Amino acid sequence: TDNVVNVSSDLRNLRMIKTSVELAQIKESAEIHTEVYKRIPSLYIKGMTDLELQIEIEREMRLHGSIGIFRSFGENMDIFMGSLLAGDNAQAASPFDYALGGEGISPILPLGANGSILKSGTTIMIDMAGNYRPYMDDMSRTFSIEQAPDTAYFAHEISIKIHNSIKSFAKPGTSCSDIYNTALEIVKENNLEAYFMGTGQQAKFIGHGVGLEINEPPVFTPRSKETLVAGMAIALEPK
């Protein structure tokens, strides 16, 4: 037993920095995932439920090569290939540290779509794991059924502003906590604190690493001690 050493933290640190081959796999997966997402509007049929739309998206993902598994780092978590949240269901609290949870279709798994009919004015957030290669991507996109409320459009524009702001200064050596705090400052400037990263339950992060799993380190939190390093692959998702 004297020769047994726990190297879990060393492996986590090693996996944070991707090789060129690993980055290429993430890029390929994201490119396929993008093509699937482009098809989402054509998958919608008037009168269908959120669950029915999610099933159609999952089918499209499988046809494009997804292995159909959502692998998440550091949590004993059950989920499908991702999450589709529509309307008020997005405000249902999650048992996990998520910005948006959803009731699900059963207490067995209180997460995600709950069978709500997609009506005019409903906003839909689709957050799915692109598992088309051994190294995954994580992609969130927002849609609306016909016309969305003005508040939703405004919040979406602020989300894009946060993305662009962080992209303008994030580089090797940038503190992950500074990235979170920059996002929060923009949110406060636009009086959206009540909606930032959830309503009933607000998550305390705006992004994370991706690789063999979703939610790998680094994680962008107010107290994160990590800094960006060349070769990291991250999902930036202020909501």
Model regions and ranges:
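Active-site neighborhoods and metal-handling regions in enzymes and metal-associated proteins
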Residues: 1-239
